[in-house]
Amino acid sequence: MLTYDQFRYAFANAVDEAEAKRLYDTFPVPGSGVPLFQAAFANLNPSTEAQVDSKNPARGPMKLISGEKDHTVPWAIANASFKRQRRNKSVTEIEEIGDRGHSLVIDSGWEEAARVAKSFVDRFVFP
């Protein structure tokens, strides 16, 4: 399990100290690091479980949402994923939410990320 300082840096760097402590007490769970390493090295080992077929014709619309201050998946990584996925014939979009970190869907500003996601989904579910 991450220490509080690790969690604060990786997930809760864009919120104040009190909220970071609340998030740490509420959300972290111990788990294996194996999936993270598989994802990190997926391009070096294409047979890993994390392999993604970016040209899969059955893939639906995709919206990548990134936090401007995200230390865990910074813009460069999110944008690289977007560039790979946009080769797909289905709609692929990316949006960066300003002044937000990796906790953007669980912290006090979650509504903004939810609005971005909902407006994207509504375009395809309720056209």
Annotate each predicted stretch with a short phrase.
Residues 40-48:
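Short gly/ser/thr-rich secondary-structure transition/capping motifs
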Residues 57-58, 64-66, 70:
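Short beta-strand/loop motif that positions the catalytic acidic residue
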Residues 6, 22, 80, 112, ...:
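Alpha-helical elements of Rossmann-like donor-binding domains used by nucleotide-donor carbohydrate transfer enzymes
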Residues 57-59, 87-89:
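Short, well-ordered coil/turn elements that cap or connect secondary structure elements
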Residues 71-80:
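Conserved alpha/beta-hydrolase "acid-adjacent" motif
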Residues 88-127:
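Catalytic active-site module of serine/aspartate enzymes centered on a nucleophile-bearing elbow/loop
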Residues 48-58:
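The feature captures the conserved acid-bearing segment of alpha/beta-hydrolase catalytic domains
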Residues 1-30, 34-41:
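Helix-rich cap/lid subdomain of alpha/beta-hydrolase
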